[in-house]
């Protein structure tokens, strides 16, 4: 009668040893895949298969990595950052002049016509009179002007402009679409940066 109550273990249940083997094999497969991808990436870079030309279309991966890294860095570095320069016509006019001297060659004047260099940049330089950054916090514009953006034509002005002058540029950019009359008159005086197309 004892044999009637005996139960047998299902043969499909994994033992601890089999489970550990499965996990080890799975991890080994992941490591192998990572090594293969790293080697493929190295070969692609070494053989020139990764585009390095400024007029080449970036891959989706490159665009994602660049935008994600930039946005994360700006968000991290601008927390609690506020413009110490008081808004005034005088400070805005200084901002206009600083923009004209340092930025207009790439980002245009009030006519929003791009210069020849601006049309050849990767990424194409936005013409701020029409593709403005008025919606951005001043701290974001300050960060971009001060630090630049890697792998683009946007340079850093850390060594050439004082922080207070960068803040004046940021203030001007923030108010570009609603400038006081005296400031707008100065803005309209900035010479066009428009380039000449090839003949």
Show where each model-derived region lies.
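A ubiquitous short alpha-helical element
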Residues: 63-66, 112, 133
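N-terminal start-of-chain detector that recognizes signal peptides
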Residues: 56-58, 76-78, 99-104, 126-128, ...
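Short, flexible loop/turn segments with low-complexity composition
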Residues: 182-192
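Periplasmic c-type cytochrome electron-transfer domains
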Residues: 4, 11-93, 97, 117, ...
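Extracytoplasmic electron-transfer domains, predominantly the class I c-type cytochrome c fold
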Residues: 120-175
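Periplasmic/extracellular electron-transfer cofactor-ligation site
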Residues: 90, 96, 100-123, 149-156, ...
């Amino acid at each position: 009668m004892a044999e009637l109550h005996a139960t047998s273990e299902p043969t499909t249940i994994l033992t601890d040893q089999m489970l550990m083997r499965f996990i080890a094999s799975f991890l080994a497969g992941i490591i192998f895949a990572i090594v293969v991808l790293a080697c493929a990436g190295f070969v692609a870079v070494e053989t020139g298969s990764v585009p390095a030309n400024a007029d080449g279309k970036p891959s989706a991966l490159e665009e994602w990595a660049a935008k994600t890294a930039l946005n994360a860095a700006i968000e991290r570095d601008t927390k609690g950052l506020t413009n110490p320069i008081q808004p005034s016509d005088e400070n805005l006019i200084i901002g206009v002049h600083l923009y004209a001297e340092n930025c207009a060659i790439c980002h245009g004047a009030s006519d929003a016509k791009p210069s020849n260099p601006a049309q050849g940049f990767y990424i194409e330089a936005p013409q701020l009179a029409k593709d403005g950054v008025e919606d951005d916090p001043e701290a974001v514009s300050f960060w971009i002007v001060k630090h630049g953006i890697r792998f683009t034509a946007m340079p850093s002005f850390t060594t050439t402009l004082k922080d207070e002058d960068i803040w004046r540029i940021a203030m001007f950019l923030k108010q570009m679409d609603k400038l006081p009359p005296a400031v707008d008159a100065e803005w309209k005086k900035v010479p066009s940066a428009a380039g000449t197309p090839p003949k």
